Amino acid sequence: MKQYRPDTTCIHAGYTPGNGEPRVLPIVQSTTYTYDSSKEMGDLFDLKADGFFYTRLGNPTLDAVEKKLAALEGGVGALVTSSGQAATMMAVLNICHAGGHVVCSNAVYGGTFNLFYKTLHEMGIDCTFVSPNCTEDELNAAFRETTRCVFAETLTNPSLVVTDLEMFANAAHAHGVPCIVDNTFPTPINCRPFEFGVDIVTHSTTKYLDGHAVQLGGAIVDSGNFDWNNGKFPEFTEPDESYHGIVYAEHFGKAAYIAKARCHLMRDIGAQAAPMNAFYLNLGMETLALRMERHCSNAQKIAEFLEQDDRVAWVNYPGLESSPYHELAMKYMPHGTCGVISFGIKGGREAATRFMDSLELASVVTHVADLRTCVLHPASTTHRQMTDEQLKEAGVSPDLIRLSVGIENPEDILDDIKQALEKATK
């Protein structure tokens, strides 16, 4: 397919109907697929041929969405999963095993922090957390001989720190390991991490990519740029006995990482997305570019208002010139960051609660990044499993309100915020 600009790619990539075929991506709601001979089926199981034989490993609807995601990010392949957490876990387990080590930003989504801090530790994988604001020397000091990857979020949730992608990627490569980033908040419309040296991207597709809070899902996208032949990753360069001795780096070339994630981990873990969810995700992605433009313009307007209001103690939005991350945002996301703002109002945690309870248009929900404006208090919800010290290190203060600005008329959103501020600060 011709390489189009991102907004056109959102609509057309992944699925090209033939003569007399449906114009809209069909839902192939089937677990299995028929073939004329046992040999054809055997070749599929041995990875000697392309095709679908069981939806856990591939499905026409999922395949179209994966191709669209890969095209948007500029990668060689993608794998959709049942959730963003599944994508993060599989992205790491694909290259890191018991006895291994990961370097991870400490300013990440609470569930991601617990995955690295607790669950992977119980599986024998250690993690060293670093601040996304760390210096190059501090970052390099976190590596060990057993380090197998670096993980960070492009824009951290909910503290909205802009990660220096080139610094993290360069450090990873200097130690012979790939850099993985979660690109959920900016989406490939606003940031393409592969252009800055990142090797693997993950997404919670539940958020902006879907955009309507309809489907739960995740994705892994492979740039195809990392060289697995450096001696640190024998799982790619030595025979996999569970697939009759296939060597992923030889057989799949630049797509070795994403092929192994599908053939090995998805086979064994089974965290596959449902075809219906992939269909909804595709519908959402068709309007992604339009929605992100509105999310960002609305958020900019709201952030500028909050910055000037005396009842507001502080505001963090990378689009503001006053943000300490504005320069990095302009480097990595020059056309906009996302629709999420973090801020605190005078009166602390109690005032934050009164503010959220007073909102009429915006909803208080455990969600972020869909077309409806919503708010959340992360310290008592998404990050409540973290200690006070961990919250501080992650940039989640007790008064932090996470405001996910939707695509409603910005004046209506402003009116709602103004009346809630009035009630919260009486």
Give residue ranges: language-model regions.
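Well-ordered beta-strand positions enriched in small/hydrophobic/aromatic, beta-favoring residues
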Residues: 150, 218-220, 315, 341, ...
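Conserved N-terminal alpha-helix of the aminotransferase class I/II PLP-enzyme fold
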Residues: 37-89, 111-120
